[in-house]
Swiss-Prot record:
UniProt name for this protein: Small ribosomal subunit protein uS10m
Any one Gene Ontology cellular component term annotated for this protein: mitochondrion
A single GO BP: translation
Transit peptide as recorded in UniProt: 1-14
Subunit field text: Part of the mitochondrial small ribosomal subunit.
Keyword Transit peptide part of the UniProt annotation: yes
UniProt main location, coarse: mitochondrion
GO molecular function: structural constituent of ribosome
Superkingdom in the source lineage: Eukaryota
Keyword field: Mitochondrion, Ribonucleoprotein, Ribosomal protein, Transit peptide
Protein task: Involved in mitochondrial genome encoded proteins translation. Involved in the binding of tRNA to the ribosomes.
Organism listed in the record: Kluyveromyces lactis (strain ATCC 8585 / CBS 2359 / DSM 70799 / NBRC 1267 / NRRL Y-1140 / WM37)
HAMAP family xref list: Ribosomal_uS10
Amino acid sequence: MNMFRQAVRSFVRYQSTTSLNPKILPFNAKETPIPKCVEAVYHAPLKIEPTHRDLIADIQLRSYDNENLDFFSSFVLRAGYYLGIPMKGPKPLPTKRKRWTVIRAPFVMAKSKENFERHTHARLIRLYDCNTELVETLLSYISKHGISGVGIKCNLYQREPIDLDSKKDGPELENIDISSQLQGLDDVVGAKVVELLNNPEFKKHLQ
């Protein structure tokens, strides 16, 4: 392909104020073919389409620099693809803006103010149709190879049946030793507690 006749190696800008100067290294593509893993870097990350759309987790990435954020989002999508995790995203979340107003200096410059502003960019990646072990493997991998200035937050979703039998899990009232629980109480208070626990109207609410 003509687009791969020359290898363009772009260096990631870890500071948004630095200039980006890509280096072009000419070579003969027939003599030095580009491996498939390197060629895939020039394309968008591959994704596995979810079949059941069962949401397992979502990963939120936050950073003050959107360039590092987009770079790390692409890294997370590529790692999830090779682990076989169906993923959606990255979805841009609203940018949070925070401003401060402080004095320039004490004494002479006390009446002069200076404003500072901070932008927090965020991306959302959703994980579908996988188990928690794969999610933990992905989180440990991206945490180990994370870049500075990008925060990771993960929300896991677990589903439980709603028809649980509470009688099997909870202790029965007949097996509770009330006397051992009331040793440190007053006799009058203990008698009132025993009377309340033996009340049939009160037992209805505990079943």
